[in-house]
Amino acid sequence: MASDSSFPGASSNVAEYSVSEISGALKRTVEDTFGHVRVRGEISGYRGPHSSGHAYFALKDDRARLEAVIWRGSMSRLRFRPEEGMEVIATGKLTTYPGSSKYQIVIEQMEPAGAGALMALLEERKQRLAAEGLFDPALKQLLPFMPRVIGVVTSPTGAVIRDIIHRISDRYPLRVIVWPVRVQGDTCGPEVATAVNGFNTLPDDGPIPRPDVLIVARGGGSLEDLWGFNDEIVVRAVAASHIPVISAVGHETDWTLIDLAADMRAPTPTGAAEMAVPVKADLQASLASQSARLSSAMSRFFDQKRQAHRAAARAMPSADQLLALPRRRFDEAASRLTRALFVNTQKKRVHFDGHARQLSPRLLQRRLVELERGVTMLGQRLPRALEAFLRERRTAFTHRANRLSPEPILRRTRLTGSTLEQLDRRRDQAVRLLIERVKRRSQELDRLMRTLSYESVLERGFAVVFDAQGKPVKQAAAVLPGDALSVRFRDGDVGVVARAGLTIPDPTKGQ
């Protein structure tokens, strides 16, 4: 018994509890004492909602840490999306978990710890995304001048979508496709990013046409209301969009990160509609003005061409002038040909008369008498020999007489006359061919003149460069940096300024 008395309080009246009892007592004490509390702290260990919709994380400061949980119902009512490292004010009740002797706060409401905390988080995110190049002006795309389809990412109800559709209908009616999203709350950012990515994945020839420009719009609100448009996934989706994006979030004084990533920022949703489409009446007026100017320019152009044609026609010699020299040469050739034919005919006639005199019958008769006399003399001495010889000579004479007949000469004379007639016909044909050849040459010269004119060269896509005095520039070495030049195309002149002089290519390049 003495040994039992050595334990202090062993026989005292201190109540004894089991572990479950003391844990339950602590739970009731904590919940009764701290029924509703407001706790300021920094979110730590936040990984987003669980698959069940609940969120588990901790609130901490520089000296302590408090576990926290938000049930799914409370999570859906939050007006902003919790972020790791965000300083918040949480309203809820403290409770314990007897199974592990831990206590935690069950959060019913939560809000950022003032605008300063959100602004600090916003500035940190802005600098980080800017360092990645998501706000680079080089990534900005030009808006199409006349889009066929416009995609709008906004709430399907409310004044914003009505203002956009009304403004587009007034300016230039076209097809508008609305992708409905929540524009506030925890799911705002993911829904907007999904909508932007969804529009970009639409095929060009699908049942739903792919928009040519996107408008992401929301009305004005507080920093907390617009916080979903500062979400990192929204910024990345807009920066990666292949479709130009117009940001129209809040009023003109409201700025969100989507404004920096978008290709164009509009002060209001109505302003976004005005940026997206032109005014149809203005286009019609501009088209009429351009049409009138084009008609006037064409009239002036044709007038100039007519004047140039008349001037060229006056400068060209007439057909009589072109044919004067060939005609003179032809007349001279014809005159020489006539004289030559006459002289040749006379020569042939004299030659023919000479042959005719040689074939006179009187001379033949005289020669025959002489031969008969000789034959008579010879016949007295050698009758047989003479008779044979006479027969031989008579035969030879007959043969020669036949050869000396005037018929071949007459036939040749007729042939010469036929040749003269052919020459006369050939002369007439040569004159006609010469005239045709001169006519074709004249037409070729006319076509050549039109081809070699510099207006036709301009029509083939070339240009003529003139200096400040209006003189054509023929060499690149004549152009100095800063010289004012005029480049004449087929449809007008363009003034330019030379940025550099003659550039001599390096012969070593390309080897």
Curated annotation (Swiss-Prot):
Keywords per UniProt: Cytoplasm, Exonuclease, Hydrolase, Nuclease
GO biological process, one term: DNA catabolic process
Pfam family, one: tRNA_anti_2
Enzyme type, top EC level: hydrolase
Known catalytic reactions: Exonucleolytic cleavage in either 5'- to 3'- or 3'- to 5'-direction to yield nucleoside 5'-phosphates
Enzyme Commission numbers on file: 3.1.11.6
Gene Ontology CC annotation, any one: cytoplasm
Molecular functions per Gene Ontology: exodeoxyribonuclease VII activity; nucleic acid binding
Places the protein is found: Cytoplasm
Superkingdom in the source lineage: Bacteria
InterPro entries in alphabetical order: Exonuc_VII_L, Exonuc_VII_lsu_C, OB-fold_nuc-bd_dom
Family to which this protein belongs: Belongs to the XseA family.
Subunit text: Heterooligomer composed of large and small subunits.
HAMAP family: Exonuc_7_L
Function: Bidirectionally degrades single-stranded DNA into large acid-insoluble oligonucleotides, which are then degraded further into small acid-soluble oligonucleotides.
Protein name, per record: Exodeoxyribonuclease 7 large subunit
Organism: Brucella suis biovar 1 (strain 1330)
Gene encoding the protein: xseA
